[in-house]
C-alpha cells in the first residue's frame, strides 16, 4: 500500500507543476507561483504529521490569487468529522495525500475554478487497510456564458465515460448537491464533478480514473480563461464579483469537507485557508435589480442538464 500511495504522490506533485506552469503562461505581469514547502514536526504534541508544498500566486493581472497545494499527512486517529457517517473507521490511524486548488481571477467574466484529488487510507498500519479516493472539479462563474458551462461539463463527461458511463450523471448530481449553501438556498456555481469514498472498482481502476480526471482539469479550464480574460469590465461588475466571492467564503468555512477535516485534525492553517479569495464583500439584504445581468446569474447557477 505504501508503494501505491507514493505513486499517487508522485503523480500529484508533477500535476502541481503542470498546472502552475500552464496558468503562469496566461499571466501578463510579473506574478508567478511561489513555492512554500512545509513539514509538521514529528513530536508527540502534534496530532497531525506530514509535509506539503503550497504554491501561491497573488497580485496577477489575470489571476488575482490562486493556490495549488499538495499535502501528505498522517495521524493516529481520524477526526470526528471524517467518521461521522462511517463509525467503523473511528479510532483508526490514517494517511491522506491530495492536491487541492482554487483559482480566483481578477476579471469578473473569468470564473473561479476549484479542483481536488485525494486518497485516504484508514488503518494503513494494519493487515486490512481501508482505502478510498475522492475529488472532482467545479466552476463558479460571476457573469456566466452558457458555452463555458457546456465545455466544462462536456470535458467532465468525456473523461467519466472513458471509465464508467454511470459516473458522470452520478458525480454531477453529487456535485450539484454538495456545492449548495443551505442557509442561503443558493448553489455556488454550475457544478462539475464531485465524488468521495470511491473504491467501487480495483485500486488500479480507481487510480486511473482519478488521475485522468485530474489531468482533464486544464483541458476544462484553460480555454475558458483564454476566451474571457480580456473582456472589459466596469466597477459594477467587480463589485458583484466581490459580493459573490462572499458566498465562496461562507461555503468554505461552513460546509467544505476539506477545510473542516484540516482544521479538526490539526492541519496547517495557512495552507488550509489559502483558498480564500483576496477580497470579498457582504452587503446587508442586497438584491439585484430586476432584469439585470446580476439577477440572471441566480437563474443560471441552478442544477441543469448542460449536455443535451
From Swiss-Prot:
Which residues hold substrate?
Answer: 100, 116-118, 266-268
The protein's Enzyme Commission number: 1.3.3.3
The record's principal subcellular location, in a coarse class, is: cytoplasm
Listed A to Z, the keywords are:
Cytoplasm, Heme biosynthesis, Metal-binding, Oxidoreductase, Porphyrin biosynthesis
Task: Note down the stretches annotated as region Important for dimerization.
Answer: 248-283
What pathway is it annotated to? Porphyrin-containing compound metabolism; protoporphyrin-IX biosynthesis; protoporphyrinogen-IX from coproporphyrinogen-III (O2 route): step 1/1
The answer to whether UniProt assigns keyword Signal to this entry is no
Q: Give the residues annotated as active site.
A: 114 (proton donor)
What are the record's GO terms for cellular component? cytoplasm
Q: Does the keyword Cytoplasm apply?
A: yes
Binding residues for a divalent metal cation, per the UniProt record? 104, 114, 153, 183
EC top class, in one word? oxidoreductase
Family under the similarity heading: Belongs to the aerobic coproporphyrinogen-III oxidase family.
Q: What does this protein do?
A: Involved in the heme biosynthesis. Catalyzes the aerobic oxidative decarboxylation of propionate groups of rings A and B of coproporphyrinogen-III to yield the vinyl groups in protoporphyrinogen-IX.
Quaternary assembly? Homodimer.
Q: What is this protein called?
A: Oxygen-dependent coproporphyrinogen-III oxidase
What is the species of this protein?
Francisella tularensis subsp. holarctica (strain FTNF002-00 / FTA)
Record gene name:
hemF
Amino acid at each position: 500500500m505504501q508503494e501505491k500511495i507514493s505513486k499517487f504522490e508522485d503523480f500529484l506533485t508533477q500535476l502541481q507543476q503542470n498546472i502552475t506552469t500552464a496558468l503562469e503562461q496566461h499571466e501578463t505581469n510579473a506574478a508567478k507561483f511561489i513555492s512554500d514547502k512545509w513539514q509538521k514536526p514529528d513530536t508527540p504534541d502534534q496530532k497531525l504529521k506530514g509535509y506539503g508544498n503550497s504554491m501561491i500566486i497573488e497580485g496577477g493581472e489575470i489571476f488575482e490569487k490562486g493556490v495549488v497545494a499538495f499535502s501528505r499527512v498522517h495521524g493516529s486517529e481520524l477526526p470526528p468529522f471524517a467518521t461521522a457517517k462511517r463509525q467503523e473507521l473511528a479510532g483508526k490511524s490514517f494517511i491522506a495525500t491530495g492536491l487541492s486548488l482554487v483559482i480566483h481571477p481578477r476579471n469578473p467574466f473569468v470564473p473561479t475554478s476549484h479542483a481536488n484529488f485525494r486518497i485516504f487510507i484508514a488503518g494503513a498500519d494494519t493487515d486490512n487497510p481501508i482505502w478510498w479516493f475522492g475529488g472532482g472539479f467545479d466552476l463558479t462563474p460571476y457573469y456566466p456564458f452558457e458555452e463555458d458551462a457546456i465545455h466544462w461539463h462536456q470535458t467532465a463527461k468525456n473523461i467519466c465515460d472513458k471509465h464508467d458511463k454511470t459516473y458522470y450523471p452520478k458525480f454531477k448530481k453529487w456535485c450539484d448537491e454538495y456545492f449548495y449553501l443551505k442557509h442561503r438556498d443558493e448553489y455556488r456555481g454550475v457544478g462539475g464533478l464531485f465524488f468521495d469514498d470511491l473504491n467501487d472498482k480495483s485500486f488500479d481502476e480507481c487510480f486511473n480514473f482519478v488521475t485522468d480526471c485530474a489531468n482533464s482539469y486544464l483541458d476544462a479550464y484553460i480555454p475558458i480563461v483564454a476566451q474571457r480574460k480580456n473582456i472589459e469590465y466596469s466597477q459594477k461588475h467587480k463589485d458583484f464579483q466581490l459580493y459573490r466571492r462572499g458566498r465562496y467564503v461562507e461555503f468554505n468555512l461552513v460546509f467544505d469537507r476539506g477545510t473542516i477535516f484540516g482544521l479538526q485534525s490539526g492541519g496547517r492553517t495557512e495552507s488550509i485557508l489559502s483558498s480564500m479569495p483576496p477580497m470579498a464583500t457582504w452587503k446587508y439584504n442586497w438584491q439585484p435589480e430586476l432584469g439585470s445581468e446580476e439577477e440572471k446569474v441566480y437563474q443560471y447557477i441552478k442544477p441543469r442538464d448542460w449536455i443535451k
